[in-house]
């Protein structure tokens, strides 16, 4: 019996997948627990419509990520963070992902999740540093962060 999976079923199929399964398994387990439904013409067209909508949404998200990458990589887009510095030139504290995200929002109005900023170690020195930002699985931007004396 052909069924369309409504949920992921371990060892059988993923949501939206169309698969041939034994009739008893389909009727007694999958359909009863609303994990799948019989693959009728209406169900198949619904799955195709959902796939198209998901593909369109993914394309829009990718386009937004590319546009944001262009904004972040402009020459005038430099995130400036001021820190207190001691007499020897060492900074008090360090700049982390949250500080960079907060500065991006306050200086440029760009709301960016701190988890997308790929800063391995906190920045503890004065100067300019390039920090990668993963906007999408295919799009990574590099933002310039300038640490200066307050």
UniProtKB/Swiss-Prot annotation:
GO annotation, biological process: translation
Keyword annotations of the record: Ribonucleoprotein, Ribosomal protein, RNA-binding, rRNA-binding
GO CC annotation: ribonucleoprotein complex; ribosome
Its biological purpose: Binds to the 23S rRNA.
The gene coding this protein: rplI
Family statement: Belongs to the bacterial ribosomal protein bL9 family.
Name by which UniProt lists this protein: Large ribosomal subunit protein bL9
InterPro entries: Ribosomal_bL9, Ribosomal_bL9/RNase_H1_N, Ribosomal_bL9_bac/chp, Ribosomal_bL9_C, Ribosomal_bL9_C_sf, Ribosomal_bL9_N, Ribosomal_bL9_N_sf
Gene Ontology MF terms in the entry: rRNA binding; structural constituent of ribosome
């Amino acid at each position: 019996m052909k069924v369309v999976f409504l949920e992921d079923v371990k060892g059988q199929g993923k949501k939206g997948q169309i698969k041939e399964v034994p009739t008893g398994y389909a009727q007694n387990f999958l359909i009863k627990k609303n994990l799948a439904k019989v693959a009728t013409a209406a169900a198949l067209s619904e799955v195709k419509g959902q796939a198209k909508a998901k593909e369109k949404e993914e394309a829009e998200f990718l386009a937004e990520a590319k546009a944001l990458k262009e904004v972040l990589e402009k020459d005038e887009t430099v995130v400036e963070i001021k820190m207190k510095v001691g007499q020897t030139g060492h900074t008090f504290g360090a700049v982390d992902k949250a500080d960079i995200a907060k500065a991006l929002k306050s200086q440029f109005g760009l709301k960016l999740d701190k988890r997308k900023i790929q800063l391995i170690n906190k920045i503890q020195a004065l100067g300019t540093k390039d920090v990668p930002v993963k906007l999408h699985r295919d799009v990574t931007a590099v933002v310039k962060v300038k640490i200066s004396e307050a």
